[in-house]
């Protein structure tokens, strides 16, 4: 998987595998990795972390299927939006059903889900720097507007620069905190595993909550099953669909086992968390009196090693995490809108979408966290249900592509995709590419 990330180069028609990876990571790494992980611990106990890890393997499989199928249906090399027009849903739905699903995705990505990211930025900046939410909202939409009006290629370039930087910085802080509390390693991991199976005396009564919140927050953090990573995957320049499917599966592992785990370990190693029984409202463990579940746990954890720095650092990190997630949301909304409107009307439609997206983002910054999370949960539910239906129906061809890819590797080949082998019609991009590969092979002989 790691080798595949470095393969392929960007062009005027598409992006490299590395750019596609960073674009998908910009969507996966967000509020869910910081605030979401903390709320998982708050309502599911330390055992929720284990179930976040477990759901990762299922999430990686779904990411492979959805991304590989998106590469199946790439039609040409000159339009990144057309590359994803005929999505996985086309095989699951038909006629008006497909159009309605596209509209629902646009609603989720452009209206319902950006607010929760923007709200988290506003809250963290208010806590760390005392900046009013209104001021933060104006700043966020100004920077976001510059990015999305710059075009999809600029999104790829921005993600390529920002995502590795913010993730590495966040991980270095986590490593420093773990090193400072290294003697707690056996106790913390023992607590995670015991709590995950109800064997811990303190958290044994919330075993069901540990599983539920671990799965919920794990899915929210890595966006597995939502189809978001498939959009940048479709724009990547590769010779076989399975290559990007595996790259996107790898992005799930990076997201959870590095960023989510870093957040969880910072919180647990420092003991900066509360655990609440969601059913009864009883506080089982209270280490942070008066602190609401969310990014405040992570801020307090970093403050234990870097007093006065924790809140500011997490606020800045959360800004990058949430901001890159938001412009990834816009990219997805735009590619789906391209399916619904004619090419001559796309300019106007995209401009209107940008305005709606910025308005929804600003709305999220000035509203309460409860409102923002409620809207985000609705959007998340829409994305997951729509995409899982398609994944179940399209698993077989994606699996066949993986076997084809592995067989070619065993033969010492750089895998090339033959669309006709899978009965995929009108896949001109892959048909022409395979013909060129066959011609080269014939000349070599």
From Swiss-Prot:
Protein family according to the UniProt entry: Belongs to the alanine or glycine:cation symporter (AGCS) (TC 2.A.25) family.
Matches recorded under Pfam families: Na_Ala_symp
Segments passing through the bilayer: 41-61, 103-123, 129-149, 159-179, 188-208, 249-269, 304-324, 349-369, 375-395
Membrane topology reported for the UniProt record: Multi-pass membrane protein
Keyword terms of this UniProt record: Amino-acid transport, Cell membrane, Ion transport, Membrane, Sodium, Sodium transport, Symport, Transmembrane, Transmembrane helix, Transport
Protein's recorded name: Sodium/proton-dependent alanine carrier protein
PROSITE patterns assigned to the protein according to its UniProt record, in alphabetical order: NA_ALANINE_SYMP
Source superkingdom: Bacteria
Source organism: Bacillus sp. (strain PS3)
Localization annotation: Cell membrane
Gene that this polypeptide is encoded by: acp
Its job: Mediates the active transport of alanine, driven by either an H(+) or Na(+) gradient.
Major location category of this protein: membrane
